[in-house]
Structure formats: structure tokens, C-alpha cells
């Protein structure tokens, strides 16, 4: 039951405070650890596919295991000092593992620039939350990028961490964040990371496999509660959920596209290189800046469903 209270408290903390810039965040330290490990291993292992595969596997093992051990020991030690201190530490870290408010704030900043309209400012705003090249995006392209990142990050930034913290408290949620951070830094299929990042990418695929599909189903439910097209969300999810190189990324994107009646994804540039990605959804109408706000509403409702169902199940199981 204490875990459910920690998750609920963390959800409220994220909803109220988000991630203040002045507060150190675990993901920052995870990123530094990944960079240092990568630099260390690349300097000592053979510069061959086998050497890079080994180096990447070492990172993919050390960071999650180290995160789980460190956070688990801290939570255990705090609980030994006093149960309420243990609960407070778990609440704090659970809040940091969630990104709902930060995602909503950043995407809403994009919306505000689009409706001014200030396209250069909107491109700069969206560049903070997407990995693609943004300098030549049209208004439609900026809007699509923002909606896509809300949909995708609703899964790996909110619902997946919620599910993991309900299973294993803050330590397991932060271990998931370590896996997700590795993938975001190393999981590129370019010359530099094709081999070194493979283990991180595969581990992220496994960690997100079930949460991403649950998130898509919750998104369909959220579409109904926010007066979007739930039937369309279900239909497009069933049809287009595999339209991505990742087995997980198109799950919530397809549900979102169907709920809004717009087309997402498609070709994009990353680091100056053209990627001919398939589209997701049908262009029943042109995408518009207000779709960013609609996506955020569905993200919050889907997250609320995940919290409610998860806490109820956790409470029932004890």
C-alpha cells in the first residue's frame, strides 16, 4: 500500500511542480554516466563491430543495474530510518520519473508560437522536444512534430514509468528511465551507434513492449472521454501501430492520429539525413495548432486512467 501512496504522491508532485530547472534531475546524471562510460569503453575496446557491440552491452548492463542498486539502497536506508522518510524519498523520485507537466508545458510553448504566428520561434520551441531537424519545418510540420512527441512521450515519459513504479516503486521506475535515457542517447542507426547502441535500443524495445500497448489502449479510452474519435483511434491503432522502425513508437502515435483524424509521421530529416518513414493515420482534415492541446488533454486523461487502474490493482493485491 505504501507503494501506491508513493506513486500517487509522485503523480501529484509532477502535476504541480513538474521539473524545476534549479532542481537536479536523475536523468541528467544518467546522461553524464552514459557519456563517460561510452568514452571510457571506446578508448579501450577494439574499434570493430564486435568491440562496439561489447561496449554497448556493458553500458546497457551497468547503467540499469547501477541505478536499481543505488536507488534501492537509498530507499531502503531511508525507510529504515523512518517509514515516512522512506515514503517521502519514494514520492520525490516517483515525481521526477514522470514528465507529464514538462511535456505539456513544452508542447504548449510550441502552440503559443504557432498561433502568434511566429514560425521561427515555433521551430526553436519544438526543437527542444524532438530529435528531427526543425530548421526547415513548415507550420504543419512543426504542429505534427509536437503532436507526435506528446503521443509518444505519453507512453515512455508518463504511462510506462507509472506502471514500473507501481510494480517496484521509485527504484524500478528510475531503472526504466535509465534504459529510456540510454536509448535516446545511443539508440541511433547511424554509423557511430549502429553497433554500440544496439543493446540499449533492444533493451528499450523490451522495456516498452507491454507499456506502449497498454498506453495505446488507454489513449483510445481517453479519446472517448475528451470527445475525440475513439472509434477512429481504435481503427488506426489496429492498422498503423507497426508503421515505425521501433515496435513501440507507433502505438500511441497511431491511436492519437486516429483520435484526431489527422495524418502523422512520414518522411523527416535527422542530422541532415533524409529518412523516408511511413505515415500514420488518414488526413481526414488538415492538422492545426489546437491539435497540440487536444493531444495534451488525451495524454493527461490516459495518464489518470493508468494511475487509477494501477493503484486500484496494487491496493487489491496489497
Show which residues each predicted segment covers.
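Hydrophobic alpha-helical transmembrane segments
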Residues: 1-175, 179, 187-318
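Glycine-rich phosphate/dinucleotide-binding loop and adjoining beta-alpha-beta core of small-molecule
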Residues: 184
